[in-house]
Amino acid sequence: MTSVFDEHKPSDDSHESKIVINGEEEVLEEENDNPIEEVRLTVPITDDPTLPVLTFRTWTLGLFSCILLAFVNQFFGFRSNQLWVSSVAAQIVTLPLGKLMAKTLPTKKFGFPGTNWSWSFNPGPFNMKEHVLITIFANTGAGGVYATSIITIVKAFYNRQLNVAAAMLLTQTTQLLGYGWAGIFRKFLVDSPYMWWPSNLVQVSLFRALHEKEDLQKGQQTRFRFFIIVFCVSFAYYIIPGYLFPSISAISFVCWIWKSSVTAQIVGSGLKGLGIGSFGLDWSTVAGFLGSPLAVPFFAIANFFGGFFIFLYIVLPIFYWTNAYDAQKFPFYTSHTFDQTGHTYNITRILNEKNFDINLDAYNGYSKLYLSVMFALLYGLSFGSLCATISHVALYDGKFIWGMWKKAKTATKDKYGDVHSRLMKKNYQSVPQWWFIAVLVISFAFALYACEGFDKQLQLPWWGLILACAIALFFTLPIGVIQATTNQQMGLNVITELIIGYLYPGKPLANVAFKTYGYISMSQALYFVGDFKLGHYMKIPPRSMFIVQLVATVVASTVCFGTTWWLITSVENICNVDLLPVGSPWTCPGDEVFYNASIIWGVIGPGRMFTKEGIYPGMNWFFLIGLLAPVPFWYLSKKFPEKKWLKQIHVPLIFSAVSAMPQAKAVHYWSWAIVGVVFNYYIFRRFKTWWARHNYILSAALDAGTAIMGVLIFFAFQNNDISLPDWWGLENSDHCPLAHCPLAKGVVVEGCPVF
C-alpha cells in the first residue's frame, strides 16, 4: 500500500477563498487545494475572524451540555440497558437555545477598568463558531472517563477501599496528560491536510446545514430540512427497537429453525456466535459499537470487514472445532474467565486479602486460568495490531513524517499546507507550546502524587508511571496517522497490560493504573488533536479551542468521578448480579470486561498466561506476524504500481478489525458493513452530488433521533417501571439460548445439554 498521503490527489478546480469582515467579503485568489476529495466536497473555504467565540452563551450552554452529558452517560453506563447520548443531541438542542438567548439577553457592554476590554451577555446573533465550541464542550462530556472503571472494580468487584482524593486525582490526571502529546504532534496531525480526520466531516456538514443559507435549484430541499425529516423518522422509529420490539435489534433466523441444536445456534447467533444470516433493524445495532459507517471511507470499511471475516469465519472456527486450547469446554463467544472444569474462575481463592496480590500456593492448588479461544485470539491479534501499525507507518509514511519533523524545525514556508492552513495562519494566533507543556508537567506531578501517596493504594510505582507515559508518547504519532486517515484507532490497552504484567506481576491495581495512564493519555491526545482539526476546518481560534477543551476536560472528569462515587456508595450490591434484587438494572456490564482483564493481566499475570507456565504461549507469535505482515504488501505495491487494489490493503486495520469484540458482536459488524458499503461505495460513486450534500447529515440525524428517543424511553417508561405485556419480542436477545453452551463432553452448565 502506498502512503496515505498519496492516496488522494488535489483537484484541478480552482475556487476563490473568502474572508468575511464586517459583512464584506475579501476575495483571495486561492484554490481549494486540499488533497482529499471528501474534504473539498464538505469543508467551506470561507472565514469571518470578527465573529465572537468565547461568549456568555458559549460558556453557559457549553458547560450545561458538558455536565449533563457526562452525568447521563456515566449514570447509564452502570445499567444493564446501557444508553450513550452523543454530542449530536446537544448540538441540536443548543441551537434554538442559543438563538433564544440572542433574542432575549441584554446587549449592554461592560468594560474592564483600566483596559480596552469589554464584554456583553449578548454580543450579537448566535453564530456557528459559538455553536462549534458548545459542541466541543458537549463532546468532552459525552466521551466518559476511562479511569472510573478502576474505581468501580476496586470498590464493587474486589470490595476494597480506595481513598477519595487518590481516585479523584486518578480521573483528572489520566485525562489531562494527553495535552502534552497533543502539543508535540499537532504539527503533524492537525496542520497537515493529509491528516483529514473523516469523522469530523459529519460535524462540519451538520453545522453547515444548521447555519448556512443555501441557493437551491427547483425541487431541492435544504440540508437542514433533510436533517429534520431524517431526525423525526429516526426519533419515531426507535421506540420500536428501543421499547416495543427489542428483538429486532438482532434477528437470527437460524436459531428460530433449529431450536434444540447447540451447533446450529452457535453458527446462527448474531450475539453469541458466528451470526450467519443475522441482521438488525436498529440504527444502534449499526452504529452503537463501531461508530457510524457513514463517516468511514470505503477503503477502511473494506479492510475492517475483511479482517473481521477472516477472523470470525476462517481462523476462529478452525481453532474452535479442532478444540485447540480446550476451546469446546467453554462458550464460543465470551470474555469470562474459567477454571479447568469449565466453570467461572473463583478469583477470591487466590488473592491475599491483606496485600491484595496473588497467593501462589492457593493458585497452584486451584487451577490455571482459561479463556475462550475467541478471547485468547483477540489478545493475540491485539499484539499483532500494534506491531503492524509500527511497521506500516515506518514503511509507507516514514519518509513523509521525517520530512515534516525536519521542516517543523527549519522551514518557514509550509510546503504541505492548504487553503485551510493559510486562512488559520492569516487570521489567528497559534497556541504557544508552553501551554501544552505546563498542563503536562502539572498533570504528571499530580499523577505521581496519586501513585506514590495515599499509602500507595494504586500499587503503581514512580517508574511505572514514567514508563506508561513513554509508551503513550511513542505510539501517539503512528496510531494518530492511522486514525486521522481511516477513522479507526488502535488501542494500547493490551500492550500496556502485557508490559506491566511482566514487570510487576500479581498487582491488579498497578496493572489497570498503568494501562490507564499509558492507553488513555494517548487516546486523549488523539481526541484533542481531532477536535483541533475540527476547529481547523471551522476556523475556530486555536487558543479559544484550547481553553474550552481544557475546562471541559476538568469539568467532565469531575462529574464522571462524582457520579461513579455516588452510585457505588449508594446502590447496595451494585455490580453484583448474584446479590442484586431480581430485575435490578445495576449490573455494570461495561466494567465486567475491565474486571476480567485485571484478573488475567494483573492477578495472574502474562508470565502465567502467555509463557510455557500458562495455556497460551502461542499468542506471542502474533508479535512477529504483525511486524512482518505489511512488508509483502508494501513490496508488491512498489513493484506493481499499476495494481490499484494493492494500494488499498491496510494491514493494521485488518489486524485491529476485531478490537471492538467481545462487546461488539457479529450482527453489529454485518449491519455496519452493509450500510457502509451502500453509502460510501455505491452512492458515493453513482450519486456523488447527493452524497456530498446529504451523507454526513444523514449520519448525524440518525444518531440524534435515536439518542433522544432513547433518553425519553428511559425516563418515561423504564424509570417508572412501565412495561408492556410479556411477549417474546420484548427479549433483548436474538433468541439463541443455546449459543453460549459448551460442546465438550461432560461439562455441566445450567440451561445447557450435557454431551
Swiss-Prot record:
Membrane-spanning residues: 58-78, 82-102, 134-154, 165-185, 226-246, 298-318, 370-390, 434-454, 462-482, 546-566, 614-634, 664-684, 697-717
GO molecular function: oligopeptide transmembrane transporter activity
Matches recorded under InterPro entries: Oligpept_transpt, OPT
UniProt keyword annotation of rRNA processing present: no
Membrane topology: Multi-pass membrane protein
Keywords for the protein's UniProt record, in alphabetical order: Membrane, Peptide transport, Protein transport, Transmembrane, Transmembrane helix, Transport
GO biological process per UniProt: protein transport
GO cellular component: membrane
Tissue: Highly expressed in flowers, and moderately expressed in leaves and stems.
Location in or out of the cell: Membrane
UniProt cross-references to NCBIfam families, sorted A to Z: ISP4_OPT, OPT_sfam
PANTHER family xref list: ISP4 LIKE PROTEIN (PTHR22601)
Family to which the UniProt record says this protein belongs: Belongs to the oligopeptide OPT transporter (TC 2.A.67.1) family.
Protein name: Oligopeptide transporter 1
Protein source organism: Arabidopsis thaliana
The encoding gene: OPT1
